[in-house]
């Protein structure tokens, strides 16, 4: 059978259907069970729906003020959770007055017991008004329901409409309390639909060209967006709107004027791309810029769509001249090294082929926190026989994967990093990079360089482990 029960899950046999080992000849539909509530007893690594909305989708918007309607814990959780830097430049050429506003500030209602008993809507209104007085530079306000306010039934939509009329600015209510879905993926969906229904089509861009695109699902993690925008600028393509890396609130309003939507993260933002096509006729193309071949193929596809393939070829040729020799050096150093990829969703099927085909590494394990069935089908097609694919792994499973599959390096998030280090395995953050960008040609070189530096760091030779007395 292709499904396996880890030893640490002996008391939770239902975990078996979430752990799949690829074997030749397996039925096409054999994939891990996914997008379901975490099994009680598992120490999950997942985030909540609120994290998916604020931490992924809206938190990257450079000129919006965020008001979390919650006890203080959710507000703290919503702060500084991603490395998505922003520039101060606005689409009309003006400059937003506060540098990295989205990373520096967050506000919350700090609900108390009495607010839970008697309702917190008045407090929410006061908090929004106070925040706007404190930060008049903000061009919009985003308010968020959380588990507590969702359970007591506070109507954040009504308060948002009321305050919007009072202050003359958009106040967008995001109803994605933590319990809204089994993973943060539900928060992505709620935020996509909310921003589309409330904002898209309500304003016009300062200018348009015949090569306007929306870059959707690109959150500018440690500068990824700026790498891609440079490619497009050299091709003569204008990024009209991004969703939502380094974007301003108004950019979302004129997404309907693009000639094409490019969907980068196909788990968190495919919803708005489909809505734009259905209502406004904006076609979309799913793209992948991780690794050399995927980047080359997708730049060519975009160039061919607009009838300018020669421009894409020039960009590709220029970058390959710059990175070719160094990539070969790191391939020689990384060949045969075993890697475990553990990300939220799509990077698990973006990365295996480039790591194996272009760096000579062996992907021994892939695991995700919130991938859906279509994503697991892609993962299954892109990994080799014997690779273990795990949905929603718990903390004890992480240890067993390390002990059983012996990865030389793990590409994961901050929650897994220090556990890996304690077990003597180097780890690179692949969600919110510590040393990116990792996208595009030069980004893939950065990733190769960082993996080399992590694996060959002499500190791993200095670690001492106690013998297992059992």
Swiss-Prot record:
Q: What is its EC number?
A: 1.18.6.1
Which SUPFAM superfamilies does this entry report, sorted A to Z? Helical backbone' metal receptor
Read off the InterPro entries from this record. Answer: Nase/OxRdtase_comp1 (IPR000510), Nase_asu (IPR005974), Nase_comp1_asu (IPR010143), Nase_comp1_CS (IPR000318)
- Provide the disulphide bond pattern: none
Q: Does the keyword Iron-sulfur apply?
A: yes
A GO molecular function held by the record: ATP binding
Checking Gene3D superfamilies in the record gives:
Nitrogenase MoFe cofactor biosynthesis protein NifE, C-terminal, Nitrogenase molybdenum iron protein domain
Reply yes or no: does the keyword Iron-sulfur apply: yes
The enzyme's main class, written as a single word, is oxidoreductase
Task: State the UniProt keywords alphabetically.
Answer: ATP-binding, Iron, Iron-sulfur, Metal-binding, Molybdenum, Nitrogen fixation, Nucleotide-binding, Oxidoreductase
Q: Which cofactor does it need?
A: [8Fe-7S] cluster; [7Fe-Mo-9S-C-homocitryl] cluster
- The residues listed in the UniProt record as binding [7Fe-Mo-9S-C-homocitryl] cluster, with positions renumbered to this chain, are 265, 431
Please list the GO biological process terms of this entry.
nitrogen fixation
Reaction(s) catalysed by this chain, per the record, are: N2 + 8 reduced [2Fe-2S]-[ferredoxin] + 16 ATP + 16 H2O = H2 + 8 oxidized [2Fe-2S]-[ferredoxin] + 2 NH4(+) + 16 ADP + 16 phosphate + 6 H(+)
Binding-site positions, [8Fe-7S] cluster: 48, 74, 147
Q: How is the cofactor bound?
A: Binds 1 [8Fe-7S] cluster per heterodimer.
Q: What does this protein do?
A: This molybdenum-iron protein is part of the nitrogenase complex that catalyzes the key enzymatic reactions in nitrogen fixation.
Entry similarity comment = Belongs to the NifD/NifK/NifE/NifN family.
The record's subunit annotation is: Tetramer of two alpha and two beta chains. Forms complex with the iron protein (nitrogenase component 2).
Q: Cross-referenced NCBIfam families, in alphabetical order?
A: alt_nitrog_alph, N2-ase-Ialpha
Protein's recorded name: Nitrogenase molybdenum-iron protein alpha chain
- The organism named in the record is Methanothermobacter marburgensis (strain ATCC BAA-927 / DSM 2133 / JCM 14651 / NBRC 100331 / OCM 82 / Marburg) (Methanobacterium thermoautotrophicum)
């Amino acid at each position: 059978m292709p499904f396996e029960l880890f030893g640490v899950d002996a008391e939770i046999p239902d975990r078996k259907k979430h752990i799949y080992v690829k074997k030749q000849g397996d039925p096409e539909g054999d994939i891990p069970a996914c997008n379901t509530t975490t099994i009680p007893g598992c120490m999950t690594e997942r985030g909540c729906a609120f994290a998916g909305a604020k931490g992924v989708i809206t938190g990257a918007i450079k000129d919006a003020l965020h008001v979390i309607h919650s006890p203080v814990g959710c507000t703290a959780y919503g702060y500084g959770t991603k490395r998505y830097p922003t520039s101060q430049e606005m689409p009309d050429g003006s400059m937003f007055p506060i540098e990295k506003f989205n990373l520096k500030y967050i506000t919350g209602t700090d609900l108390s017991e009495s607010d839970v008993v008697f309702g917190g809507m008045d407090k929410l209104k006061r908090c929004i008004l106070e925040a706007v007085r404190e930060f008049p530079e903000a061009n919009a306000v985003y308010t968020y329901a959380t588990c507590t306010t969702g359970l007591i039934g506070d109507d954040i939509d009504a308060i948002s409409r009321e305050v919007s009329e009072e202050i003359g600015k958009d106040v967008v209510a995001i109803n994605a309390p933590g319990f809204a879905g089994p993973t943060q993926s539900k928060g992505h969906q709620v935020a996509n639909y909310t921003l589309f229904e409330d904002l898209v089509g309500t304003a016009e861009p300062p200018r348009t060209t015949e090569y306007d695109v929306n870059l959707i699902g690109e959150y500018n993690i440690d500068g990824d967006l700026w790498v891609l925008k440079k490619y497009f600028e050299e091709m003569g393509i204008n990024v009209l709107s991004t969703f939502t890396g380094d974007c301003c609130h108004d950019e979302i309003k004129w997404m309907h004027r693009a000639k094409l939507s490019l969907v980068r993260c196909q788990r968190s933002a495919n919803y708005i791309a489909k809505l734009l096509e259905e209502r406004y006729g904006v076609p979309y193309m799913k793209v992948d810029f991780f690794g050399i071949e995927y980047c080359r193929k997708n730049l060519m596809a975009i160039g061919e769509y607009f009838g300018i393939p020669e421009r894409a070829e020039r960009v590709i040729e220029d970058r390959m001249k710059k990175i070719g020799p160094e990539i070969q050096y790191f391939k020689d150093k990384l060949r045969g090294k075993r890697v475990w990829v553990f990300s939220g969703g799509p990077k698990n099927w973006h990365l295996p082929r480039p790591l194996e085909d272009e760096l000579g590494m062996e992907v021994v394990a892939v695991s995700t926190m919130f991938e859906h069935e279509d994503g697991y089908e892609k993962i299954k097609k892109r990994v080799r026989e014997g690779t273990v694919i795990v949905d929603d792994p718990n903390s004890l499973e992480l240890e067993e994967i390390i002990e059983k599959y012996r990865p030389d390096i793990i590409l994961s998030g901050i929650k897994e990093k220090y556990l890996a280090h304690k077990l003597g395995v180097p780890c690179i953050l692949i969600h919110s990079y510590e040393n990116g960008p990792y996208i595009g040609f030069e980004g893939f070189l950065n990733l190769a360089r960082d993996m080399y530096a992590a694996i060959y760091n002499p500190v791993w030779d200095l670690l001492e482990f106690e013998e297992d007395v059992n």
